[in-house]
């Protein structure tokens, strides 16, 4: 089953993106580099619940 997760900026903490993640195959938290409009640059975004 796929879970809906939120991605938050590591620098400012702003929750910018939502995505789906397979709960069975990925146990660790997701971290991707995406654009943050608050920081006005590409930063690391971490998975939140």
From Swiss-Prot:
<keyword id="KW-0687">Ribonucleoprotein</keyword>
<comment type="similarity">
    <text>Belongs to the bacterial ribosomal protein bL33 family.</text>
</comment>
<keyword id="KW-0689">Ribosomal protein</keyword>
<dbReference type="InterPro" id="IPR001705">
    <property type="entry name" value="Ribosomal_bL33"/>
</dbReference>
<dbReference type="Pfam" id="PF00471">
    <property type="entry name" value="Ribosomal_L33"/>
</dbReference>
<keyword id="KW-0046">Antibiotic resistance</keyword>
<dbReference type="InterPro" id="IPR018264">
    <property type="entry name" value="Ribosomal_bL33_CS"/>
</dbReference>
<protein>
    <recommendedName>
        <fullName>Large ribosomal subunit protein bL33B</fullName>
    </recommendedName>
</protein>
<dbReference type="GO" id="GO:0006412">
    <property type="term" value="P:translation"/>
</dbReference>
<dbReference type="GO" id="GO:0046677">
    <property type="term" value="P:response to antibiotic"/>
</dbReference>
<dbReference type="GO" id="GO:0005737">
    <property type="term" value="C:cytoplasm"/>
</dbReference>
<dbReference type="InterPro" id="IPR038584">
    <property type="entry name" value="Ribosomal_bL33_sf"/>
</dbReference>
<comment type="function">
    <text>Plays a role in sporulation at high temperatures.</text>
</comment>
<dbReference type="GO" id="GO:0003735">
    <property type="term" value="F:structural constituent of ribosome"/>
</dbReference>
<dbReference type="InterPro" id="IPR011332">
    <property type="entry name" value="Ribosomal_zn-bd"/>
</dbReference>
<dbReference type="GO" id="GO:0005840">
    <property type="term" value="C:ribosome"/>
</dbReference>
<dbReference type="GO" id="GO:1990904">
    <property type="term" value="C:ribonucleoprotein complex"/>
</dbReference>
């Amino acid at each position: 089953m796929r879970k809906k997760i939120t991605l938050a900026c590591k620098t400012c903490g702003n929750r910018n993106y939502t995505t789906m993640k397979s709960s069975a195959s990925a146990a660790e938290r997701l971290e991707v580099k995406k654009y943050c409009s608050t920081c006005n640059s590409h930063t690391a975004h971490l998975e939140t619940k």
